[in-house]
Amino acid sequence: MRKLIFWVHTSIDGHIDGPAGEFDWPMMGEELSAYSEALCERSDTFLYGRGVWEGMVAFWPNAEKMSDHPHVLKFAPLWRSTPKIVASTTIEHDDWATEVIGTDLAERITDLKRQPGADLLLTGGSGLAGELTRLGLIDEYHIAVHPVVLGGGRPLFPRGADRLGLRFAGSRVCDEGVVVTRYDRA
């Protein structure tokens, strides 16, 4: 059975973006890029919520024209060629999305996990991650904690989320002090 992997960047004060929604603070050094690329390579489908999707589709289709960062140059072609699913009740169709899930999220994700293939990779976004956590559908949590205090922004998980015990599966320090920790569903 395929796994659903959650891969997210957060600040040490637990925010996934800054007070004004900025996402200019993650430090994608060589080691962290390699970690991210390994997660992508074991996945054959990327999953996004609407908010993260809007940021991804605004950058990655033409990323090489906007940045010459090694991570960007390696990830952009992979992003373009990998099937993408967007969970949204407000988006009906998008040229870059393979599929849009508007209703029956639990049923559709459960069905995807049962299908043959590589893993599903959920990147960022607290709303969709919170809902999929509540539904018990996320198998692995990969959390990159960056050495920055943002002082506000969206929390890693929505306020009021149910308590959930996880099993520690490993941790490592990458590049300039980014700590990546993996937890598995207990």
Regions found by a protein language model. Give the residues of each.
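Enzymes that bind and transform nitrogen-containing heteroaromatic metabolites
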Residues: 1-186
